[in-house]
């Protein structure tokens, strides 16, 4: 194990270039940026915790939803990919029973006393609650974990739709797993992070984001039994054909007033399921659903029925997307991406709020995407919870400049992220 200064010198000399290239790509421009980024993180660690300490450096990726919009919470399928935007953490184990985490861009140093295992008053919805919950999740698995000091630098920006929270959680989890020799596998780490987010942070999240950051690559997940989801990893190499780039555009609208809108999707789907004797739509016979549409319209309303239609069709579509990726048929995959986007707009109705028709950033982004990409072999769709946030597009390289310029004209400079899929999940880098 090296000191932070030794690692900085090794990185500057290019000794870690092969490792960085495996994570981010091997172009000189990319490597120069990552050398600078890792060196800066190590320097900041020294600033906050002092020089001369032996450290290890970790990476946890963000993720993009590729299919299965609002299907996971109904015990359906999910499809997501890890991306090259990630959180980097420099960490050093300590023996004082405290976890200290300083994150770039945040003024506060999180200090967690591990003798205080229970959720603390006033801590929910803050990063400290995630750290405490993850540590307690390890202990619940019988792992004897202790303190560490860390500095994190995340390129997975908050609100970018790429799950900055899952990247942060997995960064903390991989540090504890490695520094204390716990030996837990990636799915177990993901479940610990979900436990922390649900129980300590106070957000009833699913598991797909954490699984994707933990495992890496493209994940197809069957949530029929959400306590033990079936996970299939599809290798990221070759998923995107030569000359095609994944773009995610942040429409820069706030989710702060949308909790009720998100809840309504789940509530309405489950109201339909209840009419058919199930708790969620994944427990319902689809054939019976179609047979009983008149009764369901009367009892649940048209929007609930349309959202249930979205679930059944999107679930089948997600399985077909998985099959297309395994077969290497990107053209078929792209057609399914478009259909997914149209279903979110027309049936799930989570592209804009009916109560606020003047504000339709996602609608505008999708319309411009269609005008540029239709007939080019590319594809576009909304991703994530909806109503605000981000859209996803697969853009031929010849159209990248035009596409990004159009998005930035609408939503401002820097709104369009050009991404690659990443094979590795959360890992110790050096």
Where are these regions (language model features)?
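Structural signature of FAD isoalloxazine-binding scaffolds in flavoprotein oxidoreductases
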Residues: 76-96, 215
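C-terminal nucleotide
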Residues: 1-63, 88, 92-124, 220-381, ...
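Glycine- and acidic-rich phosphate- and metal-coordinating loops
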Residues: 135-157
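Glycine/serine-rich anion-binding loops at beta->alpha junctions
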Residues: 59-75, 155-172, 376-394
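Phosphate-handling active-site elements
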Residues: 140-148, 176-192, 397-410
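A short glycine/serine-rich beta->alpha loop
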Residues: 53-54, 70-77, 116-124, 154-162, ...
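Beta-strand segments within the central parallel beta-sheet cores of soluble alpha/beta enzyme folds
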Residues: 100-102, 147-154, 184-195, 334-339, ...
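Fold-level recognition of mixed alpha/beta catalytic cores in primary-metabolism enzymes, strongest
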Residues: 160-248, 430
């Amino acid at each position: 194990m090296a000191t932070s200064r030794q690692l900085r010198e090794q990185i500057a000399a290019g000794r870690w270039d092969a490792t960085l290239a495996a994570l981010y790509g091997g172009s000189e421009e990319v490597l120069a940026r990552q050398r600078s980024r890792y060196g800066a993180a190590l320097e900041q660690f020294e600033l906050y915790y002092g020089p001369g300490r032996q450290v290890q450096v970790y990476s946890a990726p963000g993720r993009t939803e590729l299919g299965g919009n609002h299907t996971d919470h109904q015990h359906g399928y999910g499809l997501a990919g890890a991306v090259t935007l990630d959180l980097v953490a420099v960490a050093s184990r300590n023996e004082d029973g405290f976890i200290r985490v300083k994150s770039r861009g945040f003024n506060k140093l999180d200090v967690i006393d591990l003798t205080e295992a229970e959720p603390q008053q006033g801590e929910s919805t803050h990063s400290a609650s995630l750290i405490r919950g993850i540590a307690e999740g390890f202990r619940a698995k019988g792992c004897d974990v202790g303190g560490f000091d860390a500095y994190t630098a995340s390129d997975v920006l908050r609100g970018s739709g790429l799950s900055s929270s899952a990247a942060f959680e997995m960064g903390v989890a991989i540090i504890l797993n490695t520094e204390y020799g716990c030996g837990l596998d990636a799915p177990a780490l993901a479940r610990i992070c979900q436990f922390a987010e649900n129980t300590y942070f106070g957000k009833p999240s699913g598991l797909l984001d954490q699984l994707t950051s933990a495992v890496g690559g493209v994940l197809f997940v069957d949530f029929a039994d959400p306590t033990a989801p079936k996970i299939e990893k599809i290798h990221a190499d070759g998923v995107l054909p030569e000359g095609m780039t994944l773009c995610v555009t942040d429409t820069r609208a706030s989710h702060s007033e949308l909790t009720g809108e998100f809840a309504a999707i789940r509530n309405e789907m489950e109201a339909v399921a209840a009419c058919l004797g199930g708790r969620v739509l994944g427990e319902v016979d689809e054939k019976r659903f179609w047979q009983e549409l008149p009764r369901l319209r009367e009892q649940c309303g048209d929007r609930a029925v349309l959202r249930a239609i979205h679930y059944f069709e999107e679930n089948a579509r997600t399985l077909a997307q998985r099959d297309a990726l395994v077969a290497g048929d990107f053209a078929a995959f792209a057609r399914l991406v478009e259909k997914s986007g149209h279903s979110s707009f027309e049936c799930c109705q989570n592209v804009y709020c009916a109560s606020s028709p003047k504000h339709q950033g996602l609608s505008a982004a999708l319309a411009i995407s269609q005008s540029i990409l239709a007939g080019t072999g590319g594809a576009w769709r909304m991703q994530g919870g909806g109503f605000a946030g981000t859209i996803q597009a697969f853009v031929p390289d010849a159209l990248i400049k035009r596409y990004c310029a159009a998005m930035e004209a609408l939503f401002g400079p820097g709104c369009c992220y050009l991404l690659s899929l990443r094979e590795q999940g959360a890992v110790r880098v050096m």
